[in-house]
Amino acid sequence: MGYLICNLRKYFIFTLVFLPLKGFSDKDKIKSIVNDTSINLIPDGGKNTEWTFQFSRDLRDWVNIPELSPVYSDEESSAAINYSKWGPIGFFRSMQTEGFYDPKYVRAIELTFEDDNWASQLASNYATGEEIPGMLKFGDETIQGVGIRYKGNTSYQRSGEKKSINISVDKTVVDADLKGYDTLNFNNANMDQTLLKEVLYFNTFKKYVACPGAGFAQLNINGENWGVYSNVQQQDGSLIRQYFGENSGDRWKAPSGRGSGAGDNSGPGGGGPPGGPGGGRPPGGPGGAGQWESGDRALLYLGDDSATYENLYELKKQKTDNPWEILINATDVLNNSPDEDFQNSVEKVMAVDSWLWFLVLENVFTDDDSYWHKGCDYMIYYEPESGRIYPIEHDGNEAFSARDVRLDPLEGEDNPNRPVISKLLAVPELRQRYIAHMRTILEREFNPENLNVLIDQYVKTIEAYVEEDPKKDFTMASFRSGITSLKNLIKTRHTYLSSHTELSKAPPSISSVSIPTVPMNDKKTVIHAQVEGFGDEGIDSVHLYYRSGSTGSYLKSEMLDDGNHDDLEAGNGVYGASIPPFLAGDKVRYYVEARSDNFSKTSVFYPATAESDPSVYRVKSKNTDQDSPVIINEFMASNKVTLPDPQGEFDDWIELHNTTDNEVNISGWYLSDNPDNPRKWVFPEGSVIAANSFLIVWADEDGKAPEGLHANFKLSSYGESVLLSSSDETMNLIMDHIQFGSQETDVSYGRLSTKPNVFEEMIPSPGKPNP
């Protein structure tokens, strides 16, 4: 019996052929044991990376193998082999899952309290939020001393024993986490007898806007089955890093509440029913009309006194010196900028496209815990790199509201207490962008064809667990009828929105947008778009939006079809524009908008996801056409005992050699292990190599080390590249580039002294001439 294992992108794949073949294995990638009766697989990968296993007879159609449970890297999954089912020839692969919040799996969580009276303790502590200690177990992992409390507002008030639960994994054990998460939320799916709505909603929302992941969990508490919960990611630093790369900005929550209005009459504020006498931005307003009519937490400008905002918003995380000034300024710009300068001004303080997606999704999914309805129950993140605030979806348990099935798609456009809606949609260009995004959601996400498939998949995932749930407050008949009602709601809502006057106007079509083949850092990059008007309607305008990097506003350039703007020839429907040169390794994001020559200027985007998922290219750089004074001379990709760094650790190292008789200042040069990103790590100021001397750089991701040069990458012993590039001022020319294969431990790879263009394995000689 033989098997073959190889690495292929995001999954490992091996072939099982029931013939006496020799077995091959990509070492340290996936360990396997196959015999006549069983198969054992141990996938390798990044920390907290989870794998699931699939089978195919033809490498086209793959099915999950229920006998092989999903496992995390370095864990083992095993199953008995049924030859009649898998033979005579079969292909197996290990695919990366979405992780702990993958909705295709029910996570079995065990909680243990020392006191059997734990439920009463949690209820007593609900008002204060005080946690009680417990033990958490997931799979083979056990964490002692986690902090547990009840959570939620309306969900806590529900009848029955099952309450929503929050867990601080690192309550007593510093830096403790469960699969990379230090806070867990298990929600009781209040008012949702399908248990699906929050999970469906969040897994669509997160594709377009910062939003928690969501899946399912089955809780066992003190040995008793407490049934199925929504497993929902915390809106914390890990979520921020997931979407923004960094977690360096302030974060606020706009909690549920009532308050001021925004109109003509001064007054101290509003309130709950029957409403208050006034408030809002000067000169005041008619007061909160009761319930959720106020705008005090909806980014309404309420003056310059920070105390007003501190009483309304919760500052969840402070990273800057003046968070309240930042928030007040954003509300001031949003509410008070003059019309002629509004769009330009608001783009500087708000990520407008992200806010429009946020509004669209809350409306389409009829979310009652929403900005359009309550003006609260959302979060805000300030990204200091761009100076703009972004929305973060907060609560999804009231999505798919049946009473709002015919909610107007432009709900709130005339409501001064919802300025994010009323101010943005008052700009014709942004109004059409909002409508275009809503069309995209209806076409790609919120429609019976798509959501019914997901619903059926989710039902298949949880139905058996729901059957065994002793704490559910509904029957299985209600569960199944709820599924039918949910599907009917989706159909009705989709039909209503699709036939709405604003949405039924057909936009132009963009059939293609060019993808640059080799965009260089020394010349402009030309972009073409093939555009056609709808019916007899012509094209009003076509625009190219672009930016370098992952933050900041997009620049806008008009695309023309006049034969003079890199558009091939006039009048052929191909519009052209160019993007200026950027630095080597920069990721340039871009998308195209076309507007109809009709009264509404109906818009369409390519890709349809616009700024939530734009097209991307990475800028290339040229090789130097002269001999480099500094070369890559030797390196070691697996250093166990050969050479310690100044901190005493045995890490990968790269040796550079100054081949000239003069010292060379390489401050601002770059070192990288990725040809697509040659500017990965920059040499700090003062990096000088003496004449005919050597310099060691530690490839160990230890940039905070006080001594030595430590790059922000490691070398792969399986083989990759090392690049040395010049500074930004000299166009990041590739000065030297080595591509290498698999490396042996404690054996270096370097240039032969007698043949300097030849690299071979050798006895290490760091800091000295090579053999």
What is the meaning of each model-derived region?
Residues T37-L41, K523-I527, F650-D652:
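Structural beta-strand segments of beta-rich domains
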Residues S73-A80, H565-S578, S693-L695, G703-P706:
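Aromatic sugar-binding surface patches on proteins
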Residues S541-A584, D597-T602, Y606-T609:
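Aromatic- and glycine-rich beta-strand/loop motifs that create alpha-glucan
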Residues Y83-P88, P580-K587:
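Surface-exposed, short loops/turns at beta-strand junctions within beta-sandwich domains
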Residues M95-T97, T484-L489, T495-S509, V513-S514, ...:
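Intrinsically disordered, low-complexity linkers and terminal tails enriched in Ser/Thr/Pro/Gly
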Residues F24-E98:
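Short, composition-biased motifs enriched in small/polar/acidic residues
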Residues M95-K524, G533-L544, G549-G552, K601-S603, ...:
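Phosphate/dinucleotide-binding and metal-coordinating scaffold of catalytic cores
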Residues S32-N35, P516-K523, V641-Q647:
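Short, solvent-exposed loop/linker segments at the N-terminal edge
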